[in-house]
From Swiss-Prot:
Compartments, as annotated in UniProt: Host membrane
UniProt entry keywords in alphabetical sequence: Antibiotic, Antimicrobial, Bacteriocin, Host membrane, Membrane, Plasmid, Transmembrane, Transmembrane helix
Entry similarity comment: Belongs to the channel forming colicin family.
Function field: This colicin is a channel-forming colicin. This class of transmembrane toxins depolarize the cytoplasmic membrane, leading to dissipation of cellular energy. Colicins are polypeptide toxins produced by and active against E.coli and closely related bacteria.
Pfam families with a match to the protein in the record: Colicin
Keyword Endoplasmic reticulum among UniProt keywords: no
Residues annotated as transmembrane: 447-467
Gene Ontology CC, one term: membrane
Compositionally biased region (Polar residues): 1-20
A GO biological process held by the record: defense response to Gram-negative bacterium
SUPFAM superfamilies: Colicin (SSF56837)
Molecular function GO labels: pore-forming activity
Protein name (record): Colicin-5
Organism: Escherichia coli
Length: 490
């Protein structure tokens, strides 16, 4: 009898290690292996180092306390793991497809072998030997088919595991992105809070507490209304139960039992009415307490706002005191008195038309031009060229408060630009038109606030200040211009 040799290709299968990336590799030749590449440790989740069903609550709480920098680093690491998982998934699909095709090929070989088995003269002569060879071939093919099927099923399982791990990484990435967004929002709010002074923070806290108190009051009010409806319903039911007891129908068998049942129902309804009434009274007490909380919160908010206003008034007063002191130190006490006089007269004053103010200023400027050299003019232009509008806006806000007006910071840039162009070209009308637009609501005080902001925030020099005060004076009257002329010796 011929020796039967199993020539089926060797098919190796390496068991999956929990917590690893599933990968595949189809070797050259007839050997096909299914392997697992070790994944990154401690990624999160249960069921393995790489991650199972979900991250533990402790890990999530710990991650929630990370800074934005830590979360961003963690996010980058997760992105790398996600890329590795996608690569592993692609390899697993390739492995599954290769092994599935291998199974199909083996099955087809078996089918062809069975189909080709027809008796011949030689086969009949060696029937016993051929039967044994045929059985050996059948067993070999059956064994190879079973082995290929098991490997194909293992590859399919590895593919499912790779997909699960990919989805788990995606879930973890979404969680990290959510935590990062919350951390960034918290940091932004902290930075905003840190930029506020104590009085502003007190107002914010009081506003928040008032909003919370109002929300609690609304909730309590809703509870009272709900319980009032219940009391109203039970009161109607109690009235009907009382009527049923009061109407006594006798003379039929068992009427006493019916009467007792009605009396029990009446007592039950009385007990229920007492219970819901007590609940309503309790809800009303809570509602009234919440009303008191709202009133107290409103008082606290008013106190905080009053403290803020006092602080702002003090700040604005300090600003103006510092402003006049600066003018005194730089240009003398007389100049400081003129500035104070301009500020005082500007309060509540209505301004002249652009043409009137410009005509008054031109007379003053024509004389002033003879005093200002090109070097002085260039210095004023350069100072206006390098204005820090952030600092200028702070000065405007403080000066405006001291004059009890509000000013739009956006006008500062327009005034600065027109002022600079006027120094360069000698055309002052655009500046006066801009000043008129800015002051249309509150009058000359707005012009004073705008122009005084430039005195504080821009190193204009003596002649630059003379121009600024001349512009302001032209809106107030000839008396102020005459004082300036006398002071400047023109």
């Amino acid at each position: 009898m011929d020796k039967v040799t199993d020539n089926s290709p060797d098919v190796e299968s390496t068991e999956s290690t929990e917590g690893s990336f599933p990968t595949v590799g189809v070797d050259t030749g007839d050997t096909i292996t299914a392997t697992l590449a070790t994944g990154t440790e401690n990624v999160g989740g249960g069921g393995g180092a790489f991650g199972g069903a979900s991250e533990s609550s402790a890990a999530i709480h710990a991650t929630a306390k990370w800074s934005t920098a830590q979360l961003k680093k963690h996010q980058a690491e997760q992105a790398a793991r996600a890329a590795a998982a996608e690569a592993a998934l692609a390899k697993a699909k390739s492995q599954r497809d290769a092994l599935t095709q291998r199974l199909k090929d083996i099955v087809n070989d078996a089918l062809r072998a069975n189909a080709a088995r027809s008796p011949s003269v030689t086969d009949l002569a060696h029937a016993n030997n051929m039967a044994m060879q045929a059985e050996a071939e059948r067993l070999r093919l059956a064994k190879a088919e079973q082995k290929a099927r098991e490997e194909a099923e293992a590859a399919e399982k590895a593919l499912r595991e790779a997909e699960r791990q990919r989805d788990e990484i995606a879930r973890q990435q979404a969680e990290t992105a959510h935590l990062l967004a919350m951390a960034e929002a918290a940091e932004a709010e902290k930075n905003r809070q840190d930029s506020l002074d104590e009085e502003h923070r007190a107002v914010e806290v009081a506003e928040k507490k008032l909003a919370e108190a109002k929300a609690e009051l609304a909730k309590a009010e809703s509870d009272v209304q709900s319980k009032q409806a219940i009391v109203s319903r039970v009161a109607g039911e109690l009235e009907n139960a009382q009527k049923s007891v009061d109407v006594k129908v006798t003379g039929f068998p068992g009427w006493r039992d019916v009467q007792k049942k009605l009396e029990r129902q009446l007592q039950d309804k009385k007990n229920e009415y007492s219970s819901v009434t007590n609940a309503l009274n309790s809800a009303v007490s809570i509602r009234d307490a919440k009303k008191t909380d709202v009133q107290n919160a409103e008082i606290k908010l008013k106190e905080a706002k009053d403290a803020l206003e006092k602080s702002q008034v003090k700040d604005s007063v300090d600003t103006m005191v510092g402003f006049y002191q600066y003018i005194t130190e730089q240009y003398g006490e007389k100049y400081s008195r003129i500035a104070q006089d301009l500020a005082e007269k500007a309060k509540g004053s209505k301004f002249s038309s652009v043409d009137e103010a410009l005509a008054a200023f031109e007379k003053y400027k024509n004389v002033l031009d003879k005093k200002i050299s090109k070097v002085d003019r260039d210095a004023i232009f350069n100072a206006l060229e390098s204005v820090n509008y952030d600092e200028l806006s702070k000065n405007l806000t403080k000066i405006s408060k001291s004059l009890k007006i509000t000013s739009r910071v956006s006008f500062l840039y327009d005034v600065g630009s027109d002022f600079k162009n006027a120094i360069e070209t000698g055309n002052w009308r655009p500046l006066f038109v801009t000043l008129e637009k800015s002051a249309v609501d509150v009058g000359v005080a707005k012009i004073v606030a705008l122009m005084f902001s430039f005195i504080v925030g821009v190193p204009l020099g003596f002649w630059g200040i003379a121009i600024v005060t001349g512009i302001v004076s032209s809106y107030i009257g000839d008396d102020e211009l005459n004082k300036l002329n006398e002071l400047l010796g023109i």
